[in-house]
Amino acid sequence: MTLSFTTHWRDELPDFYTSLSPTPLDNARLIWRNAPLAQQLGVPDALFAPESGAGVWGGEALLPGMSPLAQVYSGHQFGAWAGQLGDGRGILLGEQQLADGRRYDWHLKGAGLTPYSRMGDGRAVLRSTIRESLASEAMHALGIPTTRALAMVTSDTPVYRERVEPGAMLMRVAESHVRFGHFEHFYYRREPQKVQQLADYVIRHHWPQLQDEADKYLLWFRDIVMRTAQTIASWQTVGFAHGVMNTDNMSILGLTIDYGPYGFLDDFQPDFICNHSDYQGRYSFENQPAVGLWNLQRLAQSLSPFISAEALNAALDEYQHALLTAYGQRMRDKLGLFSQQKGDNDLLDGLFALMIREKSDYTRTFRLLSHSEQLSAASPLRDEFIDRAAFDSWFAGYRARLRDEQVDDAQRQQRMQGVNPALVLRNWLAQRAIEQAEAGDMGELERLHAALADPFTDREDDYVRRPPDWGKRLEVSCSS
């Protein structure tokens, strides 16, 4: 099969990029490929063959139709205007056109210096590349909108961070890499016509159903608000903390993008901060919904030259309701509740209060709860709590609520076990795979990827056990 690549961004937005080719790594070699995604995209096996070398995956070759470029954008970082940013180490190689009309960017991360590298070296390290590959595929398996990882190479190129690490590249695939920061860039340069040009481009290619609407810009922005609310509600439901929700890391399509110092909750701590560079806790787990709105407000400001302030504010006012509605439905699913009743929030808050007090594991708590039976006062979750009396009191109220549902255990458990994962990507699991990969053993990386692709199946291995003490103390930062 021949892959088809288009150049819409290059052809339609000439002021939004710089043309350049990747800078290959020393002795680059393919260490992982996403076989299911490759099949979905029609990528021939020959491109992954050992005799092909690193090829396109290592920036050593381009496929027919590719025309590489680095995109320019700006953004707010940790609440402050950061000015021009852009693809500092990533290069958009091309836009793959599928037969069904869908189009996917092929974006090579760690591809070398670009005009937007600022003080960086244009490289990515094996550690962060593995973390992104694992996280994006884990989130996809959980049903959360995300960029995807197609292939990964390591190399003999030394990259200097807190320590010397091997350089690596990741082929990231997404329907679009347009960020809030793309619009901010030209707004702050006082070029509103280019902001509108980009809006027209995005609507034309990603919201074509809106093109003939009189108020297409407002309808488009409202959908961005809804997508952002839905995605962040999903994060909160599975206990995912992004860690660096700058406006340049916010996808216009509502995708989870730019996996850096992320983390999944171990103990349930609403104020969990996964990024040790986030000294003020701006991007803590519990702050993510509010930050999402703040970022949307920055996007709204950039769109103000052609959408009225009144209309933008009305759309922004829909965010909280959309997020709370989505979150509430997902949490009722996690509790096995098929209907909505007035006391449901109190029931959930009561469980959360217990979990905070006992430092209960977020993922294990809900997974074990999904095995509980309505008619039994015993629950596999009970042994997780020291204060059994407090748990018994909460569980009695929960069982009473289940009796109102008139749904049998099998049906309820099936729903709960389909939304409460047995396995999430804990940082200690990623770290173990990284350490073995840095030593030349890719076996654990492959095993972990395979496990994360099936997160809702009960397991007996150590992927689902409580994290070791050292695993809870792991520090991750923006260094990658």
Curated annotation (Swiss-Prot):
ATP binds at G86, G88, R89, K109, D121, G122, R172, R179, D258. It catalyses: L-seryl-[protein] + ATP = 3-O-(5'-adenylyl)-L-seryl-[protein] + diphosphate; L-threonyl-[protein] + ATP = 3-O-(5'-adenylyl)-L-threonyl-[protein] + diphosphate; L-tyrosyl-[protein] + ATP = O-(5'-adenylyl)-L-tyrosyl-[protein] + diphosphate; L-histidyl-[protein] + UTP = N(tele)-(5'-uridylyl)-L-histidyl-[protein] + diphosphate. The keyword Transferase applies. It is an enzyme of class 2 (transferase). The active site is at D248 (proton acceptor). Its cofactor is Mg(2+); Mn(2+). Its EC number is 2.7.7.-, 2.7.7.108. Pfam families: SelO. Mg(2+) binds at N249, D258. Keywords: ATP-binding, Magnesium, Manganese, Metal-binding, Nucleotide-binding, Nucleotidyltransferase, Transferase. GO terms for molecular function: AMPylase activity; ATP binding; magnesium ion binding. Belongs to the SELO family. NCBIfam families: adnlytase_SelO, PRK00029.1. Nucleotidyltransferase involved in the post-translational modification of proteins. It can catalyze the addition of adenosine monophosphate (AMP) or uridine monophosphate (UMP) to a protein, resulting in modifications known as AMPylation and UMPylation. This is Protein nucleotidyltransferase YdiU. The gene is ydiU.
